[in-house]
Structures are given as structure tokens and as C-alpha cells.
């Protein structure tokens, strides 16, 4: 297989780009290359910054990083950050600059892109399962899903994502057989296997979200039957309804961003694609990048504890900047004491519990 790849590249170098086997996948015109470069750079940079911010807020808070719910959200943010960086760089290098790497490097890049997006979907599935357990078994939730079990589950998910994604690098390639219409060196049988795996993850997400939304419906019915008297757990039930709406929103965004890409991948298995369809696939692929950009926005807006953590960080940085601006040496000790006292008085936003994603 290595000889096949080397021979094709060597022949391409002799006859020019027209004979390069990778040229069939480099189908963008000049204006389209510019559009892809601009969109990938902006979306990738914004997505990376957002996800880094979410990761920092979770890891810098002792309270958040001990909760399984936020471990799953942190895993999602980490996967989306890696996806933003790896996908944007690899996509622009290939489609805009026509960069051709060695077989091992190319398969490493495409495997890394596949792994990060697969881990992102896997993290969403674990988040959905976490919400289901919270709503289905509220009394025993904390004993059922401990921090240790959450970490073990995340480790298994990441290892499985890496194993599935790096199979082409381990030898499952198409050379010398015909490759996929959309991905160099990737055989159609591997693409079909990956599509089935992703379909399994999506099915799990939809099935779990369905139970979450049904549980929310039951809470609404319970609320309507106890309007005239105070019932313990009422606030929790209202919270669960909002959580269900949040998960429904995440699911809708996930399907909108992923369905076009997955549909074109499945279509490529059944027929030969024209250059127009390949160009459409290239632009639809950036919808996955948009999904990575939207995920932290949804969680930042919905999670009261993350917003409270951001409020603490901003207040702390603001006071640090003010402290650095103090020129009088005799004012330094008093300024430090004042800042410490002010930090101790900072309280979460009044509505932080209303949208808390992990209040189970």
C-alpha cells in the first residue's frame, strides 16, 4: 500500500499537478478558496476561543470540575477546541494551499479530525445520558454517577473515538483499490462503518433526549396539578423543564449542522459525485465547525454556574488590574487586603441556580 501511494505521488510530480492523484479532491475555484480560507479562519478562531474560555471556567473552579455534568461539558469543550484547530488548519492547507503530505502524515491529520468530531458527538451523548439519569433517578443520582465513574466513562469514550478514527492510519486504506469520492486514501467500507458508528451515537442521543423531554412533560403535568400549594421540589421540576428545552436546542443544532455532511457522505457511497457536489460538501463540512462554535454559546447562556464562574474571574482580573495600577508602595498592603475582602463578598448572580445544568 505504501508503494502504491509513493508511485502515484511520484507520477504526479513528473507530470505536474494535472496527474496528481490528489487533484480530484482539490476542486475549489479561486473565489471559493478565498471564502473557505476566510470562513475557516474566523469560525475556527472564534470556536477555539469560546471553547478555551469554557474549559478555563470549568477547570479553574473547584466546585465545577468535581461535578460529572461539567466534566462532560469540559470534554465537549475540549473536543470542540481540538476540532476547531485541527479541522481549520488541515482543511485550509489542503483545499486552499493544495498541501500534499506523506501518506502517514495525511492519514494522521484526517484521523485527528475524525477523532475530535467523533469525541464531540460522544460527549454530547454522555451529557444526554447524564441529564436522563438526573431526571429519572433524582434521589440516587449522585451515588449512581460519581466523579470517578464519569472520568472512567470519558476515558473509554475518548479511547474508542481514537481507535475508530485512526483505523486508516493503522492500515485500513483503499490503495490500490478505488478510494472514497470525498476523502483521499479512505475506502468506502471504512466510511460506511464510520457512518454506522456515528448513526449509533446519534440514535442514542435522540433516544435519550426523547426520554428527557418526556420526563419534562411529566413535570409540567405535575406542576399544573399543584399550582395552589407549595410542593417540595417544585423549583427543581421547573429547572428540569428548562434543562429539557436546553437539550432539545442542542439536539436541533446538532442535527442541522451534521445532517447535510452525513447525507452527502452516504450519497457518495452509492454514486459518482460531480465537482459541484464535492464543492457543496466542502462548504457543508464547515457546518460541523459551526456546531463546535455554537455548543459553548448554548452552555454559557444556559448554565448559571458557568456564568457565575465567569463573573468571579472577571471581578478578580479587574481588581488585579487595579492593584497593578497602584504606584504608592505604602498602599500595596492595604490594597491587597481590600481586594481579598472584596473577593470574599462576591456572590453568584441572583438567577444562577435558575439555569444550573448540574443541580441534581
From Swiss-Prot:
Residues 60-71, 130-149, 215-246, 302-360 are cytoplasmic. Belongs to the G-protein coupled receptor 1 family. Residues 351-360 have a biased composition (Basic and acidic residues). GO terms for biological process: adenylate cyclase-activating G protein-coupled receptor signaling pathway; G protein-coupled receptor signaling pathway, coupled to cyclic nucleotide second messenger; immune response; inflammatory response; leukocyte chemotaxis; negative regulation of action potential; negative regulation of mast cell activation; negative regulation of synaptic transmission, GABAergic. Preferentially expressed in cells of the immune system with higher expression in B-cells and NK cells (at protein level). Expressed in skin in suprabasal layers and hair follicles (at protein level). Highly expressed in tonsil and to a lower extent in spleen, peripheral blood mononuclear cells, and thymus. PubMed:14657172 could not detect expression in normal brain. Expressed in brain by perivascular microglial cells and dorsal root ganglion sensory neurons (at protein level). This is Cannabinoid receptor 2. Changing residue 244 to E: Loss of ligand binding. Alters agonist-induced inhibitory effect on adenylate cyclase. The modification Phosphoserine is found at residues 335-336, 352. Keywords: Cell membrane, Cell projection, G-protein coupled receptor, Glycoprotein, Inflammatory response, Membrane, Phosphoprotein, Receptor, Transducer, Transmembrane, Transmembrane helix. PROSITE patterns: G_PROTEIN_RECEP_F1_1, G_PROTEIN_RECEP_F1_2. Induction: In macrophages, down-regulated by endocannabinoid anandamide/AEA. Constitutively phosphorylated on Ser-352; phosphorylation increases cell internalization and desensitizes the receptor. Residues 1-33, 93-104, 173-188, 268-279 are extracellular. Glycans are attached at residue 11. GO terms for molecular function: cannabinoid receptor activity. Changing residue 130 to A: Loss of ligand binding. Alters agonist-induced inhibitory effect on adenylate cyclase. It is a multi-pass membrane protein. It comes from Homo sapiens (Human). It is found in: Cell membrane; Cell projection, Dendrite; Perikaryon. The modification Phosphothreonine is found at residue 338. The keyword Cell membrane applies. Heterotrimeric G protein-coupled receptor for endocannabinoid 2-arachidonoylglycerol mediating inhibition of adenylate cyclase. May function in inflammatory response, nociceptive transmission and bone homeostasis. Residues 327-360 are annotated as: Disordered. InterPro entries: Canbinoid_rcpt_2, Cnbnoid_rcpt, GPCR_Rhodpsn, GPCR_Rhodpsn_7TM. The chain crosses the membrane at residues 34-59, 72-92, 105-129, 150-172, 189-214, 247-267, 280-301. One of its GO terms (cellular component) is dendrite.
Amino acid at each position: 500500500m505504501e508503494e502504491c501511494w509513493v508511485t502515484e505521488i511520484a507520477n504526479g510530480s513528473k507530470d505536474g499537478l494535472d496527474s496528481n492523484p490528489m487533484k480530484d479532491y482539490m476542486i475549489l475555484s479561486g473565489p471559493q478558496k478565498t471564502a473557505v480560507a476566510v470562513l475557516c479562519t474566523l469560525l475556527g478562531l472564534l470556536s477555539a476561543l469560546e471553547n478555551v474560555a469554557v474549559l478555563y471556567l470549568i477547570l479553574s473552579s473547584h466546585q465545577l470540575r468535581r461535578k460529572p455534568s461539567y466534566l462532560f461539558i469540559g470534554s465537549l469543550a475540549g473536543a470542540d477546541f481540538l476540532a476547531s484547530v485541527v479541522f481549520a488548519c488541515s482543511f485550509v492547507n489542503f483545499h486552499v494551499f493544495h498541501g500534499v503530505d506523506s501518506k502517514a502524515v495525511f492519514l494522521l491529520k484526517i484521523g485527528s479530525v475524525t477523532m475530535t468530531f467523533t469525541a464531540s458527538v460522544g460527549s454530547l451523548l454522555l451529557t444526554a445520558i447524564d441529564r436522563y439519569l438526573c431526571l429519572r433517578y433524582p434521589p440516587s443520582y449522585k451515588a449512581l454517577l460519581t466523579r470517578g465513574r464519569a472520568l472512567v466513562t470519558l476515558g473509554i469514550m475518548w479511547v474508542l473515538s481514537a481507535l475508530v478514527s485512526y483505523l486508516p492510519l493503522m492500515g485500513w486504506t483503499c490503495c490500490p483499490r478505488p478510494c472514497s469520492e470525498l476523502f483521499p486514501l479512505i475506502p468506502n467500507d471504512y466510511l460506511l462503518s464510520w457512518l454506522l458508528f456515528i448513526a449509533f451515537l446519534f440514535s442514542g442521543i435522540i433516544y435519550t433526549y426523547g426520554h428527557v423531554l418526556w420526563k419534562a412533560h411529566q413535570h409540567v403535568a405535575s406542576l399544573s396539578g399543584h399550582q395552589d400549594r407549595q410542593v417540595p421540589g417544585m423549583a427543581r421540576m421547573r429547572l428540569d423543564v428548562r434543562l429539557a428545552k436546553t437539550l432539545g436546542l442542542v439536539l436541533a443544532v446538532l442535527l442541522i449542522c451534521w445532517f447535510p455532511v452525513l447525507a452527502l457522505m452516504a450519497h457518495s457511497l452509492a454514486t459518482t459525485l460531480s465537482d459541484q457536489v464535492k464543492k457543496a460538501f466542502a462548504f457543508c463540512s464547515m457546518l460541523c465547525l459551526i456546531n463546535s462554535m455554537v455548543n459553548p454559546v448554548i452552555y454559557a447562556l444556559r448554565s448559571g454556574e458557568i456564568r457565575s464562574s465567569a463573573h468571579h474571574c472577571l471581578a478578580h482580573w479587574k481588581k488585579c488590574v487595579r492593584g497593578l495600577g497602584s504606584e504608592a508602595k505604602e498602599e500595596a498592603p492595604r490594597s491587597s487586603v481590600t481586594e481579598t475582602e472584596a473577593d470574599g463578598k462576591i456572590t453568584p448572580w441572583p438567577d444562577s441556580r435558575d439555569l444550573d445544568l448540574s443541580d441534581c
